[in-house]
């Protein structure tokens, strides 16, 4: 049986998950691919901690010892970070090695360049795990949705924020209370900034947009707002109005343009995304012929993410064994849409905290707040109305949520 040797860069949560799947599912993988997948070497900071515990793998802290090994044909990068990972992946591709990575930050910043290097060296760069964790999202976009013109993508792509918002909604707790519990139980990092401010979701949105439209948008060019200002009052009012609040990463086509943003939305309870609870993720893709499809599952964690990584490795091995040439798993070489910073007309829900909510039109929480609605309005018009609300005596704060209907 043909053997494909793997160099594993990183042996943490995801890296160890890759090892365990390849070990436990060895016979099944060999039957499906016709290839024996063997981790030859693994990059770790302290090799001596692993040498006596795991046999059959050479652990090293010298990345060149792995990248210069001509017998290794596939590099799996699960290091995290950008600069060091970029240098490793770039060198691997230039050396004629296939690469599988779960590194969304790396791909958001350097994905176009790395994809070009992969093309020039006739190797594969696969990264299914970078956006949906265990959810197969990117390959369907490339292989199955490509015959459609994508009209919109809305995604719950961060498990931490979805866990927090679900807990706030179902338990009636504040953001601060739920965040503390999430950190204590390992659902949120000690420094949750990347998650709760929407940065993690923005990196994933960049990758989705690149694959769906061929449009490369920088991180700084995307409007982003996290969940730190969402209150239990907002969630109560949303529920009374037939909605829930979700942090969505979205890209919407409008003619020849696409508009991207990451922010909390009021999502209709009749929409499939409203049913996505706790750490689960889901991505809604709407195509002109296909209509709307929903891809749903575990968005993070050792086994879901490692499963996607192994699936990419198996795909490469199968293609190599059968000498098959498939649709490249890469961005379009030419953009089909142009990025715009002007938001399209949208529906909005506006929460007004005031001691006199009855004086406003909308759904009221007595003596606390009111949720009022605007349909198909521009951001500029909405800002004028919000400014007017803020001048009214008794109004404390005003919060804005775009609306996603079913």
Residue positions per predicted region:
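N-terminal glycine-/serine-/threonine-rich beta1-alpha1-beta2 phosphate-ribose binding loop
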Residues: 1-94
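Rossmann-fold NAD(P)-binding glycine/threonine-rich loop
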Residues: 85-91, 104-141
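A short hydrophobic/small-residue beta-strand
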Residues: 98-100
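Conserved anion/nucleotide-ligand pocket segment
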Residues: 143-208
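Substrate-binding/catalytic subdomain of NAD(P)-dependent oxidoreductase enzymes
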Residues: 179-275, 280-282
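ATP-dependent carboxylate/acyl-activation modules
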Residues: 273-328, 335-341
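A conserved regulatory-domain signal marking ACT and ACT-like small-molecule sensing domains
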Residues: 313-315, 319-406
């Amino acid at each position: 049986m043909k053997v494909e040797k793997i160099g594993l860069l990183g042996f943490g949560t995801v890296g160890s998950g890759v090892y365990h799947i390849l070990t436990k599912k060895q016979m099944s993988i060999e039957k499906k691919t016709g290839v024996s997948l063997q981790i030859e070497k693994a990059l770790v900071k302290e090799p001596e901690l692993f040498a006596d515990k795991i046999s059959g793998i050479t652990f090293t802290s010298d990345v060149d010892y792995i990248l210069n090994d001509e017998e290794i044909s596939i590099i799996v990068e699960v290091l995290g970070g950008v600069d060091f990972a970029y240098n490793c992946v770039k060198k691997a591709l230039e050396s004629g090695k296939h690469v599988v990575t779960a590194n969304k930050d790396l791909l958001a910043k350097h994905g176009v360049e790395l994809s070009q290097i992969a093309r020039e060296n006739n190797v594969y760069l696969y990264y299914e795990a970078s956006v949906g964790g265990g959810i197969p999202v990117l390959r369907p976009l490339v292989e199955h949705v490509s015959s459609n013109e994508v009209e919109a993508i809305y995604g719950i792509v961060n498990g931490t924020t979805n866990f927090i918002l679900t807990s706030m909604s179902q338990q009636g707790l504040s953001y601060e209370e739920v965040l503390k519990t999430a950190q204590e139980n390992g659902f949120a990092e000690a420094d949750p900034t990347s998650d709760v401010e929407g940065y993690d979701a923005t990196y994933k949105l960049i990758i989705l947009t690149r694959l769906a439209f061929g449009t490369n948008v920088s991180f700084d060019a995307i409007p982003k707002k996290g969940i730190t200002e969402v209150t239990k009052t907002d969630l109560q009012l949303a529920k009374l109005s037939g909605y829930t609040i979700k942090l969505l990463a979205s890209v919407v086509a409008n003619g020849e343009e696409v508009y991207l943003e990451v922010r909390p939305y009021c999502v209709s309870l009749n929409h499939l995304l409203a049913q996505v609870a706790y750490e689960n993720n889901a991505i809604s893709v709407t195509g002109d012929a296909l209509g709307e499809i929903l891809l749903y599952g575990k968005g993070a964690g050792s086994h879901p993410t490692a499963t996607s990584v192994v699936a990419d490795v198996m795909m490469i091995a199968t293609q190599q064994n059968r000498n098959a040439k498939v649709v490249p798993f890469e961005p379009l070489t030419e953009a089909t849409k142009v990025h715009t910073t002007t938001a399209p007309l949208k529906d909005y829900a506006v929460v007004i905290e005031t001691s006199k909510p009855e004086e406003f039109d909308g759904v009221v929480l007595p003596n606390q707040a009111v949720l009022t609605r605007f349909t198909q309005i521009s951001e500029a018009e909405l800002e004028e109305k919000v400014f007017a609300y803020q001048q009214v005596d008794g109004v404390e704060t005003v919060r804005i949520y775009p609306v996603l209907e079913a």
